[in-house]
Amino acid sequence: MRIEASPLYLDTSALAKIYVQEADSDALDAALTGRRDILISELALTELTSALARRVRESQITAAAARRIYQQLLRDVRAGEYRLLDLTPATHREAERLLLTIGRQAPLRAADSLHLALAALADVRALITYDRHLHAAALALGSFEVLPISLDPAA
């Protein structure tokens, strides 16, 4: 995957692939190597932490591994690997607007509407998601390039 657009926003499904080896992790890592224009949100940090806890409950990773991944994520944020976007009242109002417009055409969940609103308000040029619902909603919005093009239908 080659990504020309800048800046770009990673939702939680994309951020997870950086920290937990999954399908497409290597391709995404290669595409993002050396970039300094990556935006993520506080929401993604919380959602990724929830996903790590789920993987521990399901015995996919150990609690120690989850803590290591979480600590690495925080180190990367502090080191400036990502620009961290906050959820603000304006973000919530935009998400609500998207739910009432795009949400009529595409399945748009509340958390996904927040990711979409964050990306739109930050004027990103590309959104990277591996979530099929967010992918469809982002395409319906039409404000930026939506990657990756191929998605796992089971996602």
Briefly describe each language-model feature range.
Residues 9-10, 26-87:
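PIN/NYN-family metal-dependent endoribonuclease catalytic core
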Residues 14-15, 44, 91, 115, ...:
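Alpha-helix capping/helix-boundary segments
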Residues 26, 93, 135-136:
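Alpha-helical elements of the RecA-like P-loop NTPase motor core of helicases
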Residues 78-103:
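Acidic catalytic patch
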